Design a protein with these regions (language model features):
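Extreme N-terminal starter segment of soluble prokaryotic enzymes
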Residues: 2-6
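Short acidic/histidine-rich motifs immediately flanking catalytic phosphotransfer sites
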Residues: 66-73
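Short Gly/Thr/Asp-enriched flexible loops that form oxyanion-binding sites at enzyme active sites
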Residues: 84-95
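Glycine- and acidic-residue-enriched helix-capping/strand-helix junction motifs
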Residues: 17-32
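Short glycine-rich anion-binding loops that position phosphate/pyrophosphate groups of nucleotides
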Residues: 12-14, 78-81, 104-106
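Short acidic active-site motifs
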Residues: 58-62
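Short beta->alpha junction loops
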Residues: 47-57
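Short, glycine-/small-residue-rich phosphate/pyrophosphate-handling segment
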Residues: 50, 99, 108-147
Length: 147
């Protein structure tokens, strides 16, 4: 396991950040948020590897590949949060901290967004802080990986 590697996963439609519903998700692009995570991690000697996919199976494959390789996972599962049991099961096999991340606060939105199938296998969840959540998620990983 690389004690320096953090896998950052972004789910469906996050490639459209900055264009899609900016009143909810803000005007910054996914690339901007990833750069924030990379910079925050680098300041503590960590390396972020990012994957965005609109396909659940790609994210599951990335989680499987991270086993024995990455020290931690940060995941913004987007809409998959609410029904992607395959993500839940894959994350349950990962032996390291998992931080669930959301730009908005799902519990302050529509009722169908109130259930997360990721939360039961996450070490913790950061939600509702917009783009600042990416910095917070990396800081949480730094804390969780500290001896």
């Amino acid at each position: 396991v690389s004690e320096r590697l953090v896998l950052l996963l972004s789910g469906p439609n996050l490639n459209l950040l900055g264009e899609r519903e900016p009143e909810i998700y803000g005007s910054d692009s996914l690339a901007h948020h990833v750069a924030t995570a990379v910079e925050t991690a680098a300041a503590s000697g960590l390396v972020v590897e990012h994957l965005q996919s609109n396909h659940e199976g790609d994210l599951v494959d990335a989680i499987h590949a991270a086993r024995g390789r990455a020290a931690a996972i940060i995941i913004n599962p987007a809409a998959l949060t609410h029904y992607a049991w395959s993500l839940h099961d894959a994350l349950a096999t990962f032996d390291g901290p998992v931080v669930e991340l959301h730009l908005s606060n799902p519990n302050a939105r529509e009722a169908w967004r109130h259930t997360s199938v990721v939360s039961p296998v996450a070490t913790g969840t950061i939600a509702g802080f917009g783009g600042f959540g990416y910095r917070l998620a990396v800081e949480a990983v730094i804390h969780l990986l500290s001896p």
